């Protein structure tokens, strides 16, 4: 569309220039995916992470300050590989760096220059730290620019090949421990690739990145003859816009086809996909079909069945069937493969088509730039017109650029072509190829809406133009129209040819206007104020700017500004005139902010408008002089013009509006459908020029319905020509800030806008940002299904298509729609209660009843708007009140709506409604009132069309009086699913009989696990009708739901969640496939089936019964003649088939349908050979599925499929009406497992027994399961089924997995299978008295002390145990469990003879198991208290012995192995024995202590983690007692503290605890202030300390030494200051880098270690104290002698005994008298 006359080569090159004018097309360096710094405007600092906090530092370009936008609006920091996030669960310190897969809030969006996330937290800077605050105005910018952080949004990078079907990259993605934020290269992939999900290692989803490439290498195929390169994305399935963006991101475009040769090349590709997108679209409002690369649309190959002139619901994108080469219009949101295309030759110089050239023509001809034009006054056919032009030496007009179109529209027709005019464009080919009659090349096409519409296989086709834009239309060449002739004129060489413009240099003429560029950059308005009024004028200005600025990026001021900073832009006064805004040409994401002035850009976005700062920004100017008076503007509608009936307005509006909401329409629609709906009425979706209009518009709408609504408006950017800018669908220019910056994200795909309308008054309680939430719009994907509003100018009359049902407003104005009912508010006359009831009845309605919170809220709001706050209005009491929650206050909820007054009268007002509805009123009071009609009148005539009801057409499948349609919508809510079915002219399925149930089941294969059916009700009402209004006469709810206490969560503010809706379950092989579940209607489930009714009943699913019919993998044939069972066998053999075996619910349902429709029973291949004890299939298949009738009074040996679909026994010699034969195809059932050796019983009326290995299983749902069923009752039931059956036991992991598989067939409605575990003799065992040799408890060893518990196997394979302590939990367990019985066909051999013995002798020790949850240290202590040790292993036999203990116990157990420096080489046994045997092959798990798991798995765990027990052993031989000397010269031991022992001149003490080095020093100081960590002076002391540790061993042989290395001189020294005169380093650490040291007591060597790592024993050392004991004894003896002497003297004085003195006695102090013997143990 952008060229004049160019050659084919130049036309091909034109593509690149046009693409380069797109902001979306540039290579990745300008795509917005590049890293940047984040600058705080006030401080100029940049933020960066520091230990997961975010701090502000001086800016630099280093990696530690670089950030990047990545997928899902996350900010990724390059160096830390983390994302900026907010943990809203924390009140403070909530902003941090998180892993990019964290569940905290990681998304960020921009609002002007601020950055915000969830709950309106904004990024702020406080005291040098980045914080999140709800009250901040901090401004953030990209480093090196004035742009906000979202100025260049993140662009998706799409993929090909791989296994992601073209989905875009997910950045960052995780591989190993590295997060990648860009595509990566490696040898395993053919090009740069990325993951398409967050974790590549988990999902393994990937694709080759589609990045810009120069030339046609790599993914591209070159065709030099055509001059283009092609990229065939055959496995990549995208929507049209996604495919378009994928091509654009590579500097290419979607496929366009311009000749039969190119069509043949594309369709001739052998490996091309069957259907591929074309770039053909009509996404630009008010324009026709065009190529997305803007090449002329002159070649066409439409499919004959494609409506290129869409009616309501039409499509605006095109695809090609590559087998036929035909083009089809399809929904732009459908998913197709695609082909990208780009030109080979990228060089192009466009011809000058805009320079004014003075031209001379004959009288009556219009001169313009070298050509002469003549508009004929007469009408002729195209051929006659062509001949007449030839007679003038001219030809019919050809147009090659917008400059030519402008001449036609503005000069020939004065701005409006009111009647069609012939052009010289004509097609005589099939496929169509349009050519100019003058032989010039077609370089421009300018099609009108829905054009070119070429009749199939009918030529010739000719082209006319019409309308204000002069757009083109295909017409019959015989039609008589006026025409324009064109010929070359005489170019005048006169220098005064531009005399219309001022004589100054630089003025350029365009039409009757002159323009000049002022080359000095200046602020806004310095030179002049340029106005731009049309697309033609914009194109001319682009030409001027491009010629002026061919290399630099300059800006040129326009006169557009927002003087009041309201976000509303208008032209400044120019030449004394202020013009209205009639045209806009914004760049993408513009207008970005209010209060600015608008400049035009150059370069790759030539001519696009951008908002700039009026004062600080400097740009060039273009001044404009108009030589002739401006034409008066067309008469606009007046505010007081009337609106049509049923349309609404507000005083300041020039438009009328009509709302199409879900209560009044058949279905919600996507944006295109809604716009075409409005166009069919002569209207458009709404447009706005001022923000005040929006508020008034929302105020107008919010009283017309209840609840929150999203409504389509006309704002969109669907067309590639818009280059990412917004436009209104009615061509109203965009003159205001229409989209908040926060909603400009995802601009590549979200191309249509909707406005939110909701009620305000009730929201103040819980909404903090009411003004923002009150009414705003945001972009949606255009395929979203929403309600909409149509807009028509005031004074206009809407069109009335046949399908439209115009609204009758009524005498009291338009109704308000609330929850599916119409309400009229009758303000006059005032009547009493009974009169009001009669008045409503006379108008086919009722006095309004309030039954819900939503209804109350909506009515209250309406009353507040139309009457005084205290004005009372009559309402009616509810006859069947619905129990609903609603908000009574901020503190409490009212659980019962108080509408239960019977015949009493009620009124309410907007202010006192709560009091009003709680008391009776005076029934005779005269009041206004509210009438209600329950069935809303639809604005669309939706009742199934009689013609459509005759038969089921196209993809609809007939059954009886219904048609069923398979659809695949993905997960949707119930209301969305219902709307989708409405869009097909149907409803969700209603299941009215067993026959319909079977038919639906037969359609279920390949569908999702759960799908909606048309049943909806509340928890407080009885289910009695389907959504198609049919009575509920049949139900098939899953038996597990019977009697179950139901708990479906509801969202208080989501009305839909208060309703329950039904699902049909697709459980694959399960016999319960087809049963119904129910859930909240707001949940999302699959929609797979819709239905509609047909007047003709289809009674035969296949017409000819002699014909074989395929269903799934089998061929079936019905023999319709009387047969015995054996006769049926022979008949099937004659057909080389078998009597049918039914092995799954789908086959059963399919065949049951045949029996139902024919009302005939049929023999099937099931019979008994042992007098009805067991039944089997005649072809030897396993009986794994059954459908026995509930009662079968008489048992016989053969089986029929009866007319009700159930199996019943019959006498084999009876004649039945027929039989079903089949030929099995590829078997769908799994092959019988090799280990399934058991032959299971198969009695009548029993669920089939399922074989696995040597056992048979029966999974049951008991009839009274909602009542308590004890394990004993389950055991009794099993014994009744079979004498050898018992309740379920599980012997190994394979059996556990098998049972889980069976449980999952219940689709999580059942959560457990009950296990047959009982409690006897203080231990758990199976009901058959065998031991639990295999267990899989969820929480480890259960703590059970009695038999009051239930055990069950869960859907995740773990075993759960539930005690009877909590009644609710026990009942929940009962109601969500199924029972299972088991027959072990081979007697189970209990290898261990029951439970594990308490003591187990082995070699020189006795072993026992601590059977309780303990840490490693607790286990060590428990073993020690019983006089033993944790077990150790020293040879393979010992390893097998311990592993056997663990296997028999069934739980992971601690052993005595630990490491205290974190390395495997330092493992030690806690009993002090040598680590001389390694019992594992590898031990990679973290942790310092070792657990032995069942199956012989040795694993490292954290020593403080809790395990299910430990293995202890106690040696049979006692340890040898060793004594050490305790000296009085050593300190006295503190209470419970270690004893001091003497060696040489020092005392030594050690506790039984492990310490770090710093702790060891502290411990010694606490024992005695002069004690230090042990120092060693010689070999003897070294041996003493080592022996002391071995004899008092505990956990480890590592002992801290008080020897450390100085950092300065690297010398070693003892902590007590002594010189280092003796060392004994082990060889392997002699040159180690540790600065501390330990003694290894086992080999008496020293090792260098790091001071801060590991743990060891602490030995403290202190010098001997002086010996004061002898002195004390002597002093005590002397005192005693003194006392004795005094006593003797006293006695002598009393008895006068004579003193003779003491005998001579000598006392000698014993050398060892102060020594005691302390016991110790020796190995």
Swiss-Prot record:
Keywords: Disulfide bond, Endocytosis, Glycoprotein, Lectin, Membrane, Phosphoprotein, Receptor, Repeat, Signal, Transmembrane, Transmembrane helix. Residues 225-341, 368-486, 493-625, 652-791, 959-1092, 1111-1223, 1252-1375, 1402-1514, 1543-1662 form the C-type lectin domain. The keyword Transmembrane helix applies. GO terms for biological process: endocytosis. It is found in: Membrane. Glycans are attached at residues 135, 345, 377, 529, 843, 865, 935, 1077, 1104, 1226, 1321, 1393, 1594, 1627. Residues 33-182 form the Ricin B-type lectin domain. The modification Phosphoserine is found at residues 1704, 1720. Residues 28-1667 are extracellular. Its main location: membrane. Acts as an endocytic receptor to direct captured antigens from the extracellular space to a specialized antigen-processing compartment. Causes reduced proliferation of B lymphocytes. This is Lymphocyte antigen 75. It comes from Mus musculus (Mouse). The gene is Ly75.
């Amino acid at each position: 569309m952008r060229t004049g006359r160019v050659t084919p080569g130049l036309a091909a090159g034109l593509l690149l220039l046009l693409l380069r004018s797109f902001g979306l097309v540039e290579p990745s360096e300008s795509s917005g995916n590049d890293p940047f710094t984040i600058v705080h405007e006030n401080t100029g600092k940049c933020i960066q992470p520091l230990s997961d906090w975010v701090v502000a530092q001086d800016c630099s370009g280093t990696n530690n300050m670089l950030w990047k936008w990545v997928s899902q609006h996350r900010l990724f920091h390059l160096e830390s590989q983390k994302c900026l996030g907010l943990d809203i669960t924390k009140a403070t310190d909530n902003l941090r760096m998180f892993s990019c897969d964290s569940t905290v809030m990681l998304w960020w969006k921009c609002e002007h220059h601020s950055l915000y996330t969830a709950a309106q937290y904004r990024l702020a800077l406080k005291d040098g730290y980045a914080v999140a605050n709800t009250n901040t105005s901090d401004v953030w910018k990209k480093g090196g620019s004035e742009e906000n952080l979202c100025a260049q949004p993140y662009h998706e990078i799409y993929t090909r090949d791989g296994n992601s079907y073209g989905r875009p990259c997910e950045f960052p993605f995780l591989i190993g421990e590295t997060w990648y934020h860009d595509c990566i290269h490696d040898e395993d992939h053919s090009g740069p690739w990325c993951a398409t999900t967050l974790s590549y290692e988990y999902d393994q989803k990937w694709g080759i990145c589609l990045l810009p490439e120069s030339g046609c290498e790599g993914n591209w195929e070159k065709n030099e003859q055509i001059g283009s390169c092609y990229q065939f994305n055959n496995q990549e399935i995208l929507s049209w816009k996604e495919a378009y963006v994928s091509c654009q991101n590579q500097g290419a475009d979607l496929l366009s086809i311009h000749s039969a040769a190119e069509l043949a090349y594309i369709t001739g590709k052998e490996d091309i996909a069957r259907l591929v997108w074309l770039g053909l679209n009509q996404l630009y409002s008010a324009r026709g079909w065009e190529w997305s690369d803007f090449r002329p649309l002159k070649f066409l190959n439409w499919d004959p069945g494609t409506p290129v002139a869409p009616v309501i619901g039409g499509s605006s994108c095109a695809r090609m069937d590559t087998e036929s080469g035909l083009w089809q219009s399809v929904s732009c949101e459908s998913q197709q493969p695609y082909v990208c295309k780009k030109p080979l030759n990228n060089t192009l110089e466009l011809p000058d088509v805009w320079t004014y050239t003075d031209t001379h023509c004959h009288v009556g001809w219009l001169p313009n730039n070298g050509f002469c034009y003549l508009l004929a006054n007469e009408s002729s056919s195209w051929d006659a017109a062509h001949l007449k032009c030839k007679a003038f030496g001219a030809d019919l007009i050809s147009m090659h650029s917008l400059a030519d179109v402008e001449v036609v529209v503005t000069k020939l027709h004065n701005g409006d072509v009111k009647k069609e005019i012939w052009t010289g464009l004509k097609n005589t080919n099939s496929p169509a190829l349009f050519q100019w009659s003058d032989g010039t090349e077609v370089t421009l096409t300018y099609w009108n809406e829905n054009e070119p519409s070429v009749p199939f296989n009918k030529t010739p086709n000719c082209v006319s133009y019409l309308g204000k834009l002069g757009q083109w239309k295909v017409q019959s060449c015989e039609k008589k129209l006026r025409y324009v002739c064109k010929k070359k004129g005489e170019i005048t060489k006169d220098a005064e040819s531009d005399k219309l413009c001022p004589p100054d240099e630089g003025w350029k003429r365009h039409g009757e206007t002159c323009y000049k560029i002022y080359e000095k950059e200046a602020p806004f308005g310095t030179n002049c104020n340029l106005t731009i009024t049309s697309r033609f004028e914009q194109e001319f200005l682009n030409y001027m700017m491009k010629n002026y600025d061919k290399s630099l990026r300059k800006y040129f001021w326009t006169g557009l500004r927002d003087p009041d900073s309201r976000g509303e832009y208008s032209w400044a006064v120019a030449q004394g005139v202020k013009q209205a805004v009639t045209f806009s040409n914004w760049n993408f994401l513009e207008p970005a902010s209010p209060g600015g002035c608008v400049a035009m850009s150059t370069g790759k976005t030539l001519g696009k408008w951008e908002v700039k700062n009026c004062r600080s920004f400097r740009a060039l100017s273009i001044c404009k002089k108009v030589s002739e008076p401006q034409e008066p503007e067309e008469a606009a509608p007046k505010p007081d013009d009337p609106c049509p009936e049923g349309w609404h307005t507000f005083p300041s509006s020039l438009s009328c509006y009509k709302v199409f909401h879900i209560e009044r329409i058949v279905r919600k629609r996507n944006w295109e459908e809604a716009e075409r709906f409005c166009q069919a009425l002569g209207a458009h979706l709404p447009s706005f020029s001022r923000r005040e209009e929006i508020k008034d518009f929302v105020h107008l709408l919010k009283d017309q319905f209840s609840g929150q609504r999203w409504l389509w408006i006309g704002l969109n950017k669907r067309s590639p020509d818009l280059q990412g800018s917004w436009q209104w669908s009615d061509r109203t220019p965009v003159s205001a800030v229409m989209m908040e910056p926060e909603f400009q994200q995802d601009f590549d795909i979200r191309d249509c806008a909707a406005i939110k309308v909701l009620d305000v008054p009730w929201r103040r309680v819980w909404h903090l940002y009411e003004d923002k939430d009150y009414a705003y719009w945001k972009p949606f994907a255009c395929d979203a299904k929403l309600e909409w509003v149509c807009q028509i100018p005031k004074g206009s009359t809407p069109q009335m298509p046949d399908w439209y049902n115009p609204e009758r407003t009524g005498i009291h104005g338009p109704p308000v729609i609330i929850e599916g009912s119409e309400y009229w508010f009758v303000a006059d006359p005032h009547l009493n209660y009974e009169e009001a009831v009669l008045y409503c009845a006379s108008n086919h309605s009722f006095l309004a009843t309030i039954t819900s919170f939503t209804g109350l809220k909506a009515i209250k709001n309406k009353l507040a708007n139309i009457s005084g706050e205290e004005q009372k209005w009559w309402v009616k009491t509810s006859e069947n009140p619905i129990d609903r929650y609603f908000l009574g206050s901020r503190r409490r909820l009212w659980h019962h709506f108080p509408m239960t007054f019977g015949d009493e009268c009620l009124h309410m007002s907007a202010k006192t409604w709560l009091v009003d509805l709680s008391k009776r009123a005076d029934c005779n009071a005269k009041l206004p009132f509210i009438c209600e009609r329950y069935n809303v009148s639809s604005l669309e005539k939706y009742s199934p069309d009689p013609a459509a009801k005759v038969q089921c057409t196209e993809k609809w499948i007939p059954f009886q009086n219904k048609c069923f349609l398979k659809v695949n919508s993905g997960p949707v809510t119930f209301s969305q699913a219902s709307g989708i079915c409405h869009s097909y002219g149907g409803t969700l399925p209603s299941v009215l009989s067993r026959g319909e149930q079977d038919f639906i089941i037969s359609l279920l294969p390949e569908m999702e696990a759960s799908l909606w059916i048309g049943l909806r009700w509340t928890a407080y009402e009885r289910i009695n009708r389907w959504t198609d209004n049919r009575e509920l006469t049949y139900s098939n709810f899953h038996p597990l739901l019977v009697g179950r206490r139901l708990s479906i969560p509801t969202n208080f503010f989501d009305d839909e969640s208060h309703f329950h809706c039904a699902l049909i379950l697709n459980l694959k092989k399960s016999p319960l496939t087809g049963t119904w579940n129910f859930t909240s209607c707001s949940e999302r489930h699959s929609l797979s089936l819709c239905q509609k009714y047909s007047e003709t009943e289809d009674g035969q699913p296949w017409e000819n019964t002699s014909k074989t019919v395929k269903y799934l993998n089998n061929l079936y044939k019905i023999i319709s003649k009387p047969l015995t069972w054996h006769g049926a066998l022979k008949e099937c053999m004659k057909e080389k088939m078998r009597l049918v075996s039914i092995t799954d619910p789908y086959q059963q349902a399919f065949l049951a349908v045949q029996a139902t429709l024919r009302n005939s029973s049929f023999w099937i291949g099931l019979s008994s050979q042992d007098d009805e004890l067991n039944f089997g299939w005649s072809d030897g298949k396993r009986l794994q599925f059954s459908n026995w009738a509930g009662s079968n009074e008489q048992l016989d040996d053969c089986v029929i499929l009866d007319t009700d679909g159930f199996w019943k026994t019959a006498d084999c010699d009876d004649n039945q009406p027929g039989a079903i034969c089949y030929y099995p195809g590829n078997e769908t059932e799994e092959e019988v497992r090799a280990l399934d050796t058991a032959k299971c019983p198969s009695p009548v009326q029993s669920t089939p027994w399922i074989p696995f290995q040597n056992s048979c299983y029966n999974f049951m749902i008991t009839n009274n399961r909602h009542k308590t069923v004890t394990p004993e009752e389950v055991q009794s039931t099993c014994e009744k089924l079979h004498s050898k059956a018992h309740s379920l036991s599980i012997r190994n992991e394979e059996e556990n997995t098998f049972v889980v598989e069976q449980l999952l067939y219940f689709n999580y409605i059942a959560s457990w299978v009950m296990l047959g575990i009982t409690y006897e003799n203080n231990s758990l065992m199976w009901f058959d008295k065998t031991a639990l040799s295999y267990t899989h408890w969820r929480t480890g060893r259960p703590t059970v002390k009695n038999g009051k518990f239930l055990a069950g196997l869960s859907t995740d394979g773990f075993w759960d145990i539930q005690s009877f302590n909590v009644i609710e939990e026990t009942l929940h367990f009962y109601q969500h469990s199924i029972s299972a019985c088991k027959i072990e066909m081979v007697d189970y051999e209990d290898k261990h003879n029951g439970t594990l013995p308490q003591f187990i002798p082995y070699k020189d020790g006795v072993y026992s198991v601590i059977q309780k949850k303990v840490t490693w240290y607790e286990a060590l202590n428990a073993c020690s208290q019983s006089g033993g040790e944790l077990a150790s292993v020293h040879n393979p036999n010992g390893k097998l012995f311990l592993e056997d203990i663990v296997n028999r116990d069934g739980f992971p157990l601690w052993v005595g192995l630990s490491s205290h420096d974190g390395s495997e080489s330092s493992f030690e046994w806690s009993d002090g024995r040598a680590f001389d045997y390694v019992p594992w092959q590898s031990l990679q798990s973290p942790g310092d202590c070792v657990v032995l798991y069942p199956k012989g798995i040795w694993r490292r765990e954290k020593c403080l983690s809790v395990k299910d027990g430990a293995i202890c052993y106690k040696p049979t031989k006692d340890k040898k007692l060793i004594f050490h000397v305790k000296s009085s010269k050593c300190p006295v031991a503190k209470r419970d503290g270690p004893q001091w022992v003497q060696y040489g001149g020092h005392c030594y003490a050690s506790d039984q605890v492990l310490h770090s080095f710093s702790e060891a020093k502290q411990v010694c100081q606490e024992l005695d202030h002069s004690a230090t960590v042990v120092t060693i002076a010689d070999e003897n002391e070294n041996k003493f300390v080592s022996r002391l540790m071995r004899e008092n061993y505990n956990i480890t042989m590592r002992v801290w030494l008080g020897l450390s290395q100085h950092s300065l001189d690297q010398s070693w020294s003892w902590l007590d200051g002594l010189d280092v005169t003796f060392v004994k380093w082990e060889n392997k650490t002699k040159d180690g880098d540790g600065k501390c040291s330990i003694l290894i007591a086992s080999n008496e060597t020293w090792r260098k270690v790091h001071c801060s790592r590991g743990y060891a024993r602490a030995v403290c050392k202190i010098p001997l104290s002086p010996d004061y004991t002898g002195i004390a004894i002597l002093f005590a003896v002397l005192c005693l002698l003194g006392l004795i002497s005094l006593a003797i003297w006293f006695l002598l004085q009393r008895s006068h005994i004579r003193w003779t003195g003491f005998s001579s006695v000598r006392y000698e102090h014993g050398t060892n008298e102060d020594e005691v013997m302390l016991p110790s143990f020796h190995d």
